[in-house]
Regions:
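Core active-site phosphate/anionic-ligand binding loop and the adjoining beta-turn-alpha structural block
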Residues: 444, 448-469, 474
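Flexible glycine/proline-rich, aromatic-decorated loop/lid segments
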Residues: 429-447
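Short, well-ordered alpha-helix to beta-strand connector turns
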Residues: 67, 74, 324, 358-359, ...
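A short, aliphatic-rich alpha-helical micro-motif
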Residues: 356, 372, 376-380, 429
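Phosphate-binding active sites in nucleotide-utilizing proteins
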Residues: 300-357, 364, 368, 382-386, ...
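Long, low-complexity hydrophobic alpha-helices enriched in A/L/V/I and glycine
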Residues: 361-365, 378, 459-460
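Glycine/threonine-rich flexible loop motifs
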Residues: 372, 389-400, 424
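Acyl-CoA thioester-binding alpha/beta core of soluble enzymes
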Residues: 1-69, 73-335, 376, 405-422, ...
Length: 604
């Protein structure tokens, strides 16, 4: 395995030293990619080839991005993460770098699969900026939908307890911070009824609670927060247990209590004839030819069948499609209800399209024997079957790996779960993003010391979990290319969240770690500026209050002192109009009336 981080001329050096702006190459991204490729190699026969990867900060984005903080500022992560707390603020972890690291490993493993199929590929290239843009793709689509783009949520206020009212985190009478989750409106109503909140009042909180996945803000009515503060943790736990609501205590410890492997691969049966192909063993055929001018992608000609919902599973299928696979999506009769959630891009939800555009849809009612038989037939004619159902549901449907692999030994069966088997025999919480952030310590790690711990309402583990699931799938495809046999692979939101490096104690921030407010926005200081507060203060002292001058004015003044700074993007729709992002973001057009990031890879 060969690793290259950066490229000369874009603030990177191949010798690992600092670039011209004093910035370091994206070492966290490279470390994550190396970790995942080592884990993949453990599942592959000795000598199996994987491709190489190259990562830099900016990729096709035509602006200077010297570090993680600059990428988060320029690509919208600070904006989306900060929606719930009153304004743009960095994630206190290297989230964009981790996403880029997974993309690099995924691309390199896909290169190996492509080579096994006769493609002349060597290297996958990606960047931290492209990882960040993929991470905000749903929010970008919603902001740019042609049929009335999403209105930015109002800036949340600070509540009586000192916490922002845009977060979903509640505080108990005895001072514990808690996160609750349910996808059932009846369970929601019953939980609050147990806390003496009338249904007419609790119902007002249901919509913002459910929409927080899409909007990254949760303006719950103050009456609900007050009701929680009147009850001790034990009472809240009892109410949650009795009503089927999941509840976890938000710890101030940033370290994960569990550290599962990124994914688990279980080899399929080692002998027997594949009933779909009639041959044994079974591997790959060469990809079908593409029209002149279209790049031949590593997974071209392979078929993925998915039965997924929300973010994690659909994203896994989406990126496999970006790698060239044909993706077939099983939806209930009448279509996935998420298709009609506003804002619409044409006749479909912009957020839904951000993860599902280009997939062929087959409708099947999996609650019926006929629907399950149809799904089985699709799976047994595919290379990959992917789902993110609740634990035990695949077995009840007769669509588990143990059910499908005997009939289709070449199949890769992928389960993307919330918590995997980390809870053992104990009741498992609802497998959603925010509870996974709490369980893995991310709820503490994403915010600096001095701030109350709370999950980011940006869907961090959902996005990362989808990418890790896709990496597990491509690893299993690489194994199949070498052995002719399929596998079952399992990954989870927890296994993805545990990938994000964080210190044993929450990070301490100085004033300059936060974006500086200006007359027309915010400015995020570069690494050299943050390391030299005296130099920054000399510039600021000569210019008055930071709000007295524009972002560009301050950036020029800082540049005159040899200090870099990045304007903080707070208008996602602006990405599609910014010439610097022309090669990274596709603007709305008649065929796709919403903005979306281009593929995060180029292959050589």
């Amino acid at each position: 395995m060969t690793v290259t981080t950066g490229r000369p001329g874009r603030g990177e050096r191949r010798d690992g030293g600092e670039g011209p702006g004093g910035e370091e190459p994206p070492a966290v991204a490279a470390k994550i990619a190396e970790l995942l490729l080592r884990h993949a190699a453990e599942a592959l026969p000795k000598g199996t080839s994987q491709g190489t990867f190259r990562i830099d900060w900016a990729g096709p984005v035509d602006t200077e991005l010297p570090d993680e903080r600059a990428v988060q500022a320029a690509c919208g992560l600070q904006h989306v993460h900060g929606r719930a707390t009153g304004g743009p603020v960095p994630l206190a972890v290297d989230y964009a770098s981790v996403v880029a690291g997974v993309l690099a490993a995924l691309g390199a493993t896909a290169v190996g699969v492509g080579r096994a199929r006769g493609l002349r590929l060597r290297e996958a290239r990606t960047s931290v900026a492209q990882g960040a843009l993929l991470a905000i793709s749903q929010y970008l689509a919603a902001a740019t939908a042609r049929e009335g783009g999403e209105v930015e949520p109002p800036v949340p206020e600070v509540g009586d307890s000192g916490g922002y009212l845009g977060l979903a985190t509640l505080v108990s009478l005895d001072g514990h911070r808690i996160e609750i989750e349910t996808l059932d409106p009846e369970a929601w109503r019953e939980f609050w009824t147990r806390l003496a909140v009338p249904p007419a009042l609790s119902g007002r909180g249901w919509l913002p609670f459910q929409q927080r996945f899409a909007t990254a803000v949760c303006p719950l009515p103050e009456v609900l927060r007050q009701a929680a503060r009147r009850h001790a943790l034990a009472e809240l736990r009892e109410a949650a247990y009795d009503t089927g609501v999941s509840l976890l205590v938000v710890s101030s410890d940033p370290l994960s209590t569990v550290n599962p492997a990124p994914w688990r691969l279980t080899p399929g049966p080692g002998q027997g004839q594949d009933t779909a192909t009639g041959v044994e063993p079974w591997g790959f055929g060469p990809p079908a030819a593409r029209p002149p001018g279209e790049p031949l992608l590593p997974l071209a000609g392979l078929r993925v069948v998915e039965s997924t919902r929300r973010v994690q599973g659909p994203l896994a299928g989406h990126v496999l499609g970006m790698l060239g696979a044909e993706v077939v999506r099983i939806e209930p009769p009448g279509g996935d209800p998420m298709r009609w959630l506003p804002p619409l891009a044409g006749d479909c939800s912009a957020r839904f399209l951000a993860l599902n555009a280009g997939k062929r849809v087959v409708e099947a009612d999996l609650t019926t024997a006929r629907g399950r038989a149809a799904a089985r037939e699709l799976a047994c004619d595919a290379d990959v079957f992917l789902h993110n159902w609740a634990p035990g549901k695949a077995a009840r449907h007769g669509l588990d790996a143990a059910d499908l692999l005997p009939a289709r030994p070449a199949l890769v069966h992928a389960w993307a779960s919330g918590f995997g088997d980390t809870f053992g025999d104990r009741p498992t919480p609802v497998g959603t993003d925010y509870l996974a952030q709490v369980y893995t310590g991310l709820a503490a790690a994403v915010r600096p010391a001095g701030e109350p711990p709370a999950p980011s309402l940006m869907t961090l583990t959902d996005m990362l979990g989808g990418l890790v699931s896709a990496q597990a799938v491509v690893t299993a495809l690489a194994r199949r290319a070498a052995t002719g046999r399929g596998s079952g692979v399992e990954s989870s939101l927890v296994s993805a969240g545990a990938l994000i490096p964080r210190p044993a104690r929450r990070v301490e921030w100085a004033a300059l770690d936060r974006p500086l407010p200006t007359a027309d926005g915010h400015l995020s200081l570069g690494p050299r500026a943050r390391r030299n507060p005296e130099a920054v203060h000399r510039v600021l002292a000569g210019g008055g209050d930071t709000r007295s001058r524009t972002t560009e004015d301050w950036r020029e003044r800082l540049a005159g002192a040899g200090l870099t700074a990045t304007p903080v993007l707070t208008d996602l729709a602006g990405l599609a109009r910014d010439p610097a992002f022309k090669a990274a973001v596709a603007p709305p057009d008649p065929a796709a009336p919403y903005a979306r990031p281009h593929s995060p890879w180029t292959f050589a």
